[in-house]
Amino acid sequence: MAPKKKPQKQSNKAASSSSSSKSNYQKPSSGPKLQISAENEDRLRRLLLNSGRSGPSIPAPISNSLSKAQKTKKLNNVYEKLSCEGFVDDQIELALSSLRDGATFEAALDWLCLNLPSHELPVKFSTGASRFPSTGGSVGVISTSRDDWNDSTDSSVRVEEEEPAVFVRVKGKQDEEDTLSSDKSSQADWIRQYMMRQEEEELECWEDEVDGIDPRNKVSGPRPFDVIAKEYYSARSDAIKAKEKRDKRGQEQAGLAIRKLKQEISDLGLSEAMLESEFQREHAFESATEQESTCPISDNLHESVDADDVSVQMLDNLTLNTNPAESYESEEIQTKALPSSSSGQDFVASDEDSEDVELGDTFFEEIPPSEISPHELLELQKEEKMRELRSEKNLGKLDGIWKKGEAQKIPKAFLHQLCQRSGWEAPKFNKETGEGRNFSYTVSILRKASGRGKNRQAGGLVTLQLPPKDENFESIEDAQNKVAAFALHKLFSDLPVHFAITEPYASLVLIWKQEELLCTTIQSTEEDRRANFVDKLLEEDSFSLTTSSSSFENSLPLVDSYVKDKDDLGVVKSNNRAKRDSYIEAECLSLQRKQENKKRTQKYKDMLKTRTALPISEVKNGILQHLKEKDVLVVCGETGSGKTTQVPQFILDDMIDSGHGGYCNIICTQPRRIAAISVAQRVADERCESSPGLDDSLVGYQVRLESARSDKTRLLFCTTGILLRKLAGDRTLNDVTHIIVDEVHERSLLGDFLLIILKSLIEKQSCDNTSRKLKVILMSATVDADLFSRYFGHCPVITAQGRTHPVTTHFLEEIYESINYLLAPDSPAALRSDTSIKDKLGSVNDRRGKKNLVLAGWGDDYLLSEDCLNPFYVSSNYNSYSDQTQQNLKRLNEDRIDYELLEELICHIDDTCEEGAILIFLPGVAEIYMLLDMLAASYRFRGPAADWLLPLHSSIASSEQRKVFLRPPKGLRKVIAATNIAETSITIDDVVYVIDSGKHKENRYNPQKKLSSMVEDWISQANARQRTGRAGRVKPGICFSLYTRYRFEKLMRPYQVPEMLRMPLVELCLQIKLLGLGHIKPFLSRALEPPSEGAMTSAISLLHEVGAVEGDEELTPLGHHLAKLPVDVLIGKMLLYGGIFGCLSPILSIAAFLSYKSPFIYPKDEKQNVDRVKLALLSDNGVSSSDLNNNDRQSDHLLMMVAYDKWVKILQERGMKAAQRFCESKFLSSSVMRMIRDMRVQFGTLLADIGLINLPKTGEFSGRKKENLDVWFSDPTQPFNMYSQQPEVVKAILCAGLYPNIAANDKGITETTFNSLTKQGNQTKSYSAWYDGRREVHIHPSSINSNFKAFQNPFLVFLEKVETNKVYLRDTTIVSPFSILLFGGSINVHHQSGSVTIDGWLKVAAPAQTAVLFKELRLTLHSILKDLIRKPEKSGIVHNEVVKSMVHLLIEEGKPQHK
């Protein structure tokens, strides 16, 4: 069997020629070289092959709609391509058998590269080095043996012998011809094996003859041509002799034998002329032998014996009974047998016997009869074609060009003649430059187009060159003639040019023609085997399908049995249902009796009297009546109406009183955890029951990481996310009777999402006409009731009046007047004339706040103004106020919070106002702690008063949140600093005074970061009224608004923009897929106010980039886990991988900084000092986690991690004041550090919530114990921190989280991308230029990498882009190619060239075997995540052998590469 082709190694000459032709062209390198030690590679391969995966993922099978012919064509195509790449049949068939009819060329290459040992692969796949570098338009025509040829019967057999080759380069043609050329690369090997088998058969036949066995009687069927020719010669000879003797009987017998032999040769598809030609040749040969004892080889051969100069006459003799490629071997044998010092006669006399052995035995001895194979038949046909080619009958094609008898011409002259005759330009011979190429030439010919229609031949410049093996020229003339002969062969293949040109060039032309004819033989033999294999493979698949179908039919009795068993099971279930209904009925009676007994108690009567006084009680009957008639109801109650606590109780009491209490299951959603907990506790108190969740209480609550419910719970308060999680397990909510959605006016993302689901459920149950129906109640204080009513099919709306005490509102200008406040010119809240434009833009200074950074990016005009005037100041509005107040308003920067004013105002309230708690609304946690720190440091709030300075936000523990509802001792004032969490749902009874900053933080998508982040912004008028209402819940109150009346009336929005219209939809899309709600866009288009098409497309695209979904929006294992983490998907991915790869603590810190902001502050004119401090932090190896070498300094994110670790160590060892001094000395923000600690705990508990890590089993981490939980997450002995001190691992996980925020220099991008990039100038740069795939970008001056000129790797990940006069990358980290391949975008392995592209523009040079290894590692990681879904409690995943090997790879191989 013929081996498959493998490109031949190119010699140094060709390499130098190829390189020299483009020596002046500068382009990117082949990419950073990815090299793995043999030990690592072998270990990883063994692990992967033993991990339960047999190889690369098998693609989806071909559609069953394809016919067998189409499947056959596809598999044949793959087979052919693999063959051309140098794989042997056994290897190809093994791969295709594994991949079945779903095989693709790429999948088969992956399988082979992963499963075959390196030494069995074609060299270019095991080393990644292409043997023929691409030259942009070359065609290689190769006739050579493969170095590692595998016989189909024994893959261990190798034939290691180089053969001569011919190489053609035709400029302007496509590289696709390279594949065709490689088909010829191993023909000589095949021929050699074939000849060896022929010799064995000859020996057998010789033995048979010795034993007296007639070979003609031994076998039946077609016989070889040579046997027939021999008999034909014998019959003709007999006929001649009989004619001479006038023996008529002998003539008749000979004639009959001749006719039979002619019929036999005709049956073989050969012409009778071949027999006659053979007879004439043998007859002439015999006559010549009788006349003189000389060799049949022409004397011309002996005059010039050279491997390249073989005469036509010699070719006639040598190629008669063999294929062309064998002639190379014959030449070598013949040359060795000819001593250069002897004449031809001497040679014949001395080596005749040797020649008989070496040549005669192989080519001239008779071949005994045997069965003719299709290959042998084709071989004979090729011999006939070669005879025809050498026949003088072809001379007619040269009419008008050359006649027999005319002097032969040198190839140069004849080529010139033919070009002139064709109307082409004269050939031009170009000397090739390079070492060792003194006589190397190419020939270029400019051809004109000719012909029309289908026969039209395109013109153009064609350049041809001989391969290196033919470049041993005697002279310039010889070099030019050889390449001219080659041009004659290629360009005038229809003409017998060998007749018209001189030797040795005529023989070379014949050799080249023989090589072309040989391809058909090899291809035909291969096609037979391939066709049989593909047919068998498809038949097996068909049989498998038939068997499956048969098995299914045979299993019908089992199915019937199963149905019968199921029917029996149904009877059991029916009995169980009857018992359950009986139990519920008893429960209904029990609840009814308890309710009646409770109503008789005085405590309940007093509480009921208080409840009845609430305004919502006036519409109680209307609410209950509407719920009996309709499935959806909107309840609109103003602040203080009591709707949140009373409506759920109305429904519960009504069902209990009507005897249906046992069936009642009410779920009331709240937008925040604190609201769910506090409302549940209040309702339990009003019902005179025990605390929520106890057995004698019907009320319970459930929030993330905290639950208080039991089997007796009939009214559950929970967050929206908890209900959505319940929907994931029970999409019909069959056991729920009522769902109450409170505070729908907030239009939160999850709230609107829940409404879509509820609407679908209501519509479905209306169609099903079920007896038990779900009831939905929407409640809000301020709401566009008609909007919700229309959305739910014009459902009824009930409005209840509010009951609040009067509240007096003082705006900013009035506060200035009342406390006689002076805004200092150097106050942070004041605009200053000495503020530079750079400072106003705030491109670096994070102290100006996140909102200001965003505004700076938007280019607010007022920040660029050189005067000190507040752009929102309208002088006519303040004519009645003092000059001091007007000056304050003129220089006020309204985007900054004036903490000095806040402190003075709080002191003013404490001094002049009656008792009552103060509630201060601030935008975020950092602002809360900044204010509380200022107050705690003041004389007024020292001692016991400091205990009543209380924060209130979603991040603090529930026990700490509950303290805000307690009353302080007499003489002490409670001061609560809160986020907008206190706007709705919760009521703090003793709050009388409200200070409203007018700010809050919204979650917005930052397109530069490709992250969602909290952005500070102004609240709406509706929010402002809600905050004001908090002051009048128990008695008349006062609201101090820290914004002007003009802003409230003219600049604030009436309502908040729904989150679905302003937030990224990525997390929402994940929930849609997790709940199995169909395709994303159709589902979201049913929203109350659908998001834009662009927003949905962007979200889906990001999910694909992150790897959360694939294909037709199919949720991946990674996406399944991300859907359970209520964080940005990039942060979630980083957290997941941080836990899996054992470096959680540093990743918690980095994720927190990415979600919040950098801890570094930049005082004016202190940038150099800050940079120096940064380097000092990285250089100090005193902290274990900062054990970094010089190369690991190239990371802003590792710097943040080190800063936090140092801060928290000082905090634990020396206390808060020492930690504060550390921050001041290192230009760090203490408030940011505290926020990072809280976020670390929050992120860690999220991972514990999904089962990725384990939390301590003892103790509840609340209050001061939160610090202990952060210590737990930092514990290096925990499995999730096993590799937390390995910077290479941390940076790899960082890459996983930040990708696709990546940039590369010219060494890491593809040539196509590099040529299409927008670059800034062409001058030579002294710095390393970076690109983001579209344009040149620059590292921001605030990054630690901005001062480096050399980088360990050509890739970096970044947090965000900032565009001014240039595009800057903020917060960068240099990452290794290993990280990109493991955690980057989609990878495309270029097996042949030994390179990998990532997302189509990044590149890495890697051998095919190594690249496929990384591809498989990705799939294995995919499987690990999938396994984690099935076993979420499997927290020891970091001990997985594949994960450990990947970590080892990152640590050992990811070190700096010296280039």
From Swiss-Prot:
Disulfide-bond pairs as recorded: none
Keywords linked to the UniProt accession: ATP-binding, Chloroplast, Helicase, Hydrolase, Nucleotide-binding, Plastid, RNA-binding, Transit peptide
A GO term, aspect molecular function: RNA binding
Entry EC number(s): 3.6.4.13
Transit peptide: 1-37
Enzyme class, broadest EC rank: hydrolase
Region feature (Disordered): 1-42, 324-352
Localization, UniProt: Plastid, Chloroplast
Low complexity compositional bias, start-end: 9-30
PROSITE patterns attached to this UniProt entry: HELICASE_ATP_BIND_1, HELICASE_CTER
Binding site for ATP: G637, E638, T639, G640, S641, G642, K643, T644
Domain Helicase C-terminal, chain residue ranges per copy: 901-1076
The organism's place on the tree of life at top rank: Eukaryota
Gene3D superfamilies: 1.20.120.1080, 3.30.160.20, P-loop containing nucleotide triphosphate hydrolases
Family membership noted in the UniProt record: Belongs to the DExH box helicase family.
Stated name of the protein: DExH-box ATP-dependent RNA helicase DExH7, chloroplastic
Organism lineage string: Eukaryota, Viridiplantae, Streptophyta, Embryophyta, Tracheophyta
